[in-house]
Amino acid sequence: MFQDGLLKGKRILVTGGGTGLGAAMGQRFLELGADLVICGRRAEVLEETAARFRSATGGTVTAVPCDVRDAAAVEAMMDRIWQAGPLDALVNNAAGNFIAETHRLSPRAIDAILNTVLHGSAYCTVAAGRRWIEAGRRNCCVLSILTLSALKGAAFRVPSAMAKAGVLAMTRSLAVEWGPKGIRTVAIAPGPFPTAGASQRLTPGGDDSAVEREIPLRRNGAHIELANLASFLLSDMAGYINGECVAIDGGKQFLSDAGSRTLELMNWTDEDWARMRAQATGKR
């Protein structure tokens, strides 16, 4: 699909890059010639992923454990990364989400999502942007992975919708503020792209068929499809795209109603919600 070496010469950091969509994007970046840095909270997972990537692609991969919720830890991570050379791109991918009745959420539950998605994305973006601006480095890019809820809201997933909408506002604001400095900020809003963790937290009973019925194309997205879109947006081919959020959702965003999933959740009983809470926390 892409020319060989599309991302050659670019050094890219993917937060939450050890698993799921972050890992899928990271491997594709390597295949297209980039040098990759992945970060996450679990050092063992990062190292296993990095070793697998090196074996599969022969590319350069650096694993840096970091909790993006901690601003000081993010600064330390960026210092460590820059010791080996500057980044050219940042992918804000670290995320968290769960289904819950909003009136039952504790402050801790709300903070768990906002701190990872909103604060973590902001900390990483500001830390990278400051270093680029101070060095006069141009042709850099921040790509943030959102969800459709950033565009439309999401009942029963309010903290995630709030956080992702905030990251979208950051993306559009910095497109104007940082554009003259040669820094692009863009975003992707994926529809359903099943991963092991998200499927357990967000799909009752682990059945994706109901979700697929809400998608006009009648299927979930494949990880390679998202990875290819991300690769394009980070490449020089997309050099005039700035402040844009691209949805990749099989047409789901254009459904005229709230979707049968939301309507189903509105009719759940207390027992249904109890089962979902147990599933989300790993209890049986």
Predicted segments with their positions:
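Active-site loop-to-helix junction immediately N-terminal to the catalytic Tyr of the SDR YXXXK motif
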Residues: 105, 153-161, 173, 197-198
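Conserved glycine-rich cofactor-binding loop
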Residues: 11, 16-20
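Short, small/polar-rich loop/turn modules that mediate ligand/substrate recognition or access, typified
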Residues: 179, 184, 241-243
